[in-house]
Amino acid sequence: MIVNIASPLYGSVQGFRRLDFSLYATVAILISVGIVMVASSSLDFAAERYHDTWFFVRKQITFLAMGLVGGLVILAVPMSVWNKYSGLLLILAFFLLMAVLIPGIGKVVNGSRRWLSLGPFSMQASEIAKFCLIVYFASYLARRNEELRTQWSGFLKLTAVLLIIVLLLLLEPDFGSSVVISATLGCMMFVAGVPLARFLLLAVSGVAGLALMAVASPYRWERLVAFMDPWATQFDSGYQLVQSLIAFGRGGWFGVGLGNSLQKLFFLPEAHTDFIFAIFTEEFGFIGAIALIGVFGFFLYRLVILFRRASEQEQFFSSYVVFGIGVMLAMQAFINMGVASGFLPTKGLTLPFISYGGSSLLITCGLMALVFRVNLELNRENQEGKP
């Protein structure tokens, strides 16, 4: 497939003036907060580990620049092209999730084989798969909507794809991504009109299966026990959660101030990645945490508005893409914040836009480019429809 990018790219850049400014500004705010918090939470750790205070900040800014360039390319591609070639994206997702399991290709980090080595960089296969799967699921729901609503075959085909994806993720293992992807597809199927009985069957089966796997795995069971009573194992499996809760406690109402966190000083592991929300709350307090949640809430609200606009204009593929992206990012944010605050067991998911992580930031930029592309196309249709 060869796509002439130059002309659409110019048109897309010119079309930025037609973007939903409030959505664009909200994304910019979240990314800016992320850069600031990566700096605040990682400076001391980077100086100790790499003898380079700005090691993580520089890498995060590099990933952001790459994400913006990649996002412009994605923005230039019409949604009809993504819809047409969605099957290739599904094949790519399968290929990457299988390749990462091969020794020598997949890189083991913290006991999980989730990373693909790409020269000086490493990419998390599940993050790329999320992008591919949202596009494929949206295309399937738009193309096979009648079959999905009225026949078991349409439902079972998509469920089979999901089961294979989840199996590959659990072999890494990546329990958190399997939960997010399963929940995202379930919600997309529900909004596409899958009968309630089938939706409930999928939901109950999924919850039961994931719960069984959590209980059957000694490692996950240990995490679950630590979550229920972290103070009983505060020097063992509950250590990370206890340190996170201490960060919340130190933050109080208004926080200790930007850069003044103590928990980031080698007390709280993964302070700049999975538990960056705890450091944010310590430095900005309960009020700051509520404000950040409010920004995420407004961001999701704008996605819901865009989803409704696409549905009203019968751009169902675009509407399902926007809805899937919204659900996926909302799930990740909810789980990350829930883990950091002790509301959920540890999952190892990043906080979208905020946490350090090249794979997460690159894919999030790509997903936002799809959202902006949908908005551009809807606005163009509105303008062309005017007398």
Swiss-Prot record:
Keyword Transcription attached: no
EC number: 2.4.99.28
GO CC annotation terms, alphabetical: cell division site; plasma membrane
Annotated metabolic or biological route of this protein: Cell wall biogenesis; peptidoglycan biosynthesis
Reaction(s) this enzyme catalyzes, per UniProt: [GlcNAc-(1->4)-Mur2Ac(oyl-L-Ala-gamma-D-Glu-L-Lys-D-Ala-D-Ala)](n)-di-trans,octa-cis-undecaprenyl diphosphate + beta-D-GlcNAc-(1->4)-Mur2Ac(oyl-L-Ala-gamma-D-Glu-L-Lys-D-Ala-D-Ala)-di-trans,octa-cis-undecaprenyl diphosphate = [GlcNAc-(1->4)-Mur2Ac(oyl-L-Ala-gamma-D-Glu-L-Lys-D-Ala-D-Ala)](n+1)-di-trans,octa-cis-undecaprenyl diphosphate + di-trans,octa-cis-undecaprenyl diphosphate + H(+)
Chief site of localization: membrane
Pfam families with a match to the protein in the record: FTSW_RODA_SPOVE (PF01098)
Keywords: Cell cycle, Cell division, Cell inner membrane, Cell membrane, Cell shape, Cell wall biogenesis/degradation, Glycosyltransferase, Membrane, Peptidoglycan synthesis, Transferase, Transmembrane, Transmembrane helix
Enzyme class, broadest EC rank: transferase
Membrane topology: Multi-pass membrane protein
Domain of life: Bacteria
GO biological process terms held by the UniProt record: cell wall organization; FtsZ-dependent cytokinesis; peptidoglycan biosynthetic process; regulation of cell shape
NCBIfam families per the UniProt record, alphabetical: ftsW
Protein name: Probable peptidoglycan glycosyltransferase FtsW
GN (gene name): ftsW
